[in-house]
Amino acid sequence: MLNKKKDFDEIYSDLMQRADGQCYSAYIGEDYLPHINMGQYRERSASVPKRLMYFLTLLIESLKNDINFPRFLMIDTPNKEGIDKDNLIKNIALLTEADKHNYENKCPFQIILTTGIDTYSEDYKKFVFFKLEGEKYLLQENILEEKC
């Protein structure tokens, strides 16, 4: 168990330092919650990489080891927390790290991300499945005709 925690801490710390230029320390505590910079207070936008990299690390661990975590991530509008566009794009680009840990594509996994238009790198445009623009809404009103 200690080896898995150590492995998690190494991956999480690496991802956090790459996601947030002000991060110098990242690990999970005995309570399994993420701790950044020895608990030093950070602005609200720092919670985006903290959570995103935490869940990405769990996904990576599930690809490497048999742990109780689905090989599936759904991330809904991480930009709501006030992170600036450039840092959001940098954080989203780190999602490709899952591929690097999925040796020989042995484990299928999926990441679904909903975010603002063009808040991802050019490399990710090929992965965009659906865009809501203009008057296009995900949910549509269904008008039924009355039959007499």
Model-derived segments and their meaning:
Residues 1-33, 61-70:
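Extended, charged coiled-coil "arm/hinge" scaffolds of SMC/Rad50-like chromosome-maintenance ATPases
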Residues 33-55, 81-87:
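Conserved ABC ATPase signature
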Residues 42, 64-67, 100-106:
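Conserved catalytic network of the ASCE P-loop NTPase/AAA+ motor domain
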Residues 46-72:
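GG-anchored amphipathic helix commonly corresponding to the ABC/SMC/Rad50 NBD signature/C-loop
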Residues 68-69, 73, 85-86, 101, ...:
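Domain-scale terminal segments
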Residues 76-78:
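Walker B catalytic acidic pair
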Residues 91-148:
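C-terminal lobe/lid and adjacent interdomain/linker elements of RecA-like ASCE P-loop ATPase modules
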